[in-house]
Structure formats: structure tokens, C-alpha cells
């Protein structure tokens, strides 16, 4: 059985929920719950409320999705922020 194609969508993070889940409002107004993809977790990419994200949604369940990319907002500048070393 072939793997089904996932729907690529963009949305805005409304709320951060427990267990690495997020409440997302898509550009078309639909709301869903999404979790972070493995690559996003692995690279420790922080997602905050108000961030614009790309996500994949299964055609079988349109109420759940997986965040695959966080879009960078050009308005924020981190040039003045001190460098923090772990």
C-alpha cells in the first residue's frame, strides 16, 4: 500500500499546549492541534505563540498536523542579544 500524500499548509501558532503540542490557526481559518516534527525537535528550534509555521496534515484527519518549519520574522533583530554558550 502506497503512502498517502500529505497536505502542506501554513498557519499561525495561537497557544502552546503541554507535551510539545500547539494550537494552530491556518491561513484559511481552520483550527487544529499540531506537534513538532523530529527534525525540529532534534535541532532545538523554539516555537512561540505568534510564530508563522509550515505544517503537514493527513488527508484522513484534518484536526491534527505536524510542524515542519518555523518561518523567521524579519522584524525581530537579535544583533544586540548577548551570545550564550552552553
UniProtKB/Swiss-Prot annotation:
S1-like domain boundaries: 1-72
Family annotation (InterPro entries): NA-bd_OB-fold, RNA-binding_domain_S1_IF1, TIF_IF1
Record's keyword terms, sorted: Cytoplasm, Initiation factor, Protein biosynthesis, RNA-binding, rRNA-binding
Superkingdom, natural source: Bacteria
Disulfide bonds: none
PROSITE patterns reported in the protein's UniProt record: S1_IF1_TYPE
Subcellular localization, as worded in the UniProt entry: Cytoplasm
GO molecular function: ribosome binding; rRNA binding; translation initiation factor activity
GO CC terms in record: cytosol
Primary localization class, coarse: cytoplasm
Classification via NCBIfam families: infA (TIGR00008)
Protein function: One of the essential components for the initiation of protein synthesis. Stabilizes the binding of IF-2 and IF-3 on the 30S subunit to which N-formylmethionyl-tRNA(fMet) subsequently binds. Helps modulate mRNA selection, yielding the 30S pre-initiation complex (PIC). Upon addition of the 50S ribosomal subunit IF-1, IF-2 and IF-3 are released leaving the mature 70S translation initiation complex.
PANTHER family xrefs: TRANSLATION INITIATION FACTOR IF-1, CHLOROPLASTIC
Family classification: Belongs to the IF-1 family.
Complexes and interactors: Component of the 30S ribosomal translation pre-initiation complex which assembles on the 30S ribosome in the order IF-2 and IF-3, IF-1 and N-formylmethionyl-tRNA(fMet); mRNA recruitment can occur at any time during PIC assembly.
Protein name per its UniProtKB record: Translation initiation factor IF-1 2
Species of the source: Polynucleobacter asymbioticus (strain DSM 18221 / CIP 109841 / QLW-P1DMWA-1)
Gene name as annotated: infA2
Amino acid at each position: 500500500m502506497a503512502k498517502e500524500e500529505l497536505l502542506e499548509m501554513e498557519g499561525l501558532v495561537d497557544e502552546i499546549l503541554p507535551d510539545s503540542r500547539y494550537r494552530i490557526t491556518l491561513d484559511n481559518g481552520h483550527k487544529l492541534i499540531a506537534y513538532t516534527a523530529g527534525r525540529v525537535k532534534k535541532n532545538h528550534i523554539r516555537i512561540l505563540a505568534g510564530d508563522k509555521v509550515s505544517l503537514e496534515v493527513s488527508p484522513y484527519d484534518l484536526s491534527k498536523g505536524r510542524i515542519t518549519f518555523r518561518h523567521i520574522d524579519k522584524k525581530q533583530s537579535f544583533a544586540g542579544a548577548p551570545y550564550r554558550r552552553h
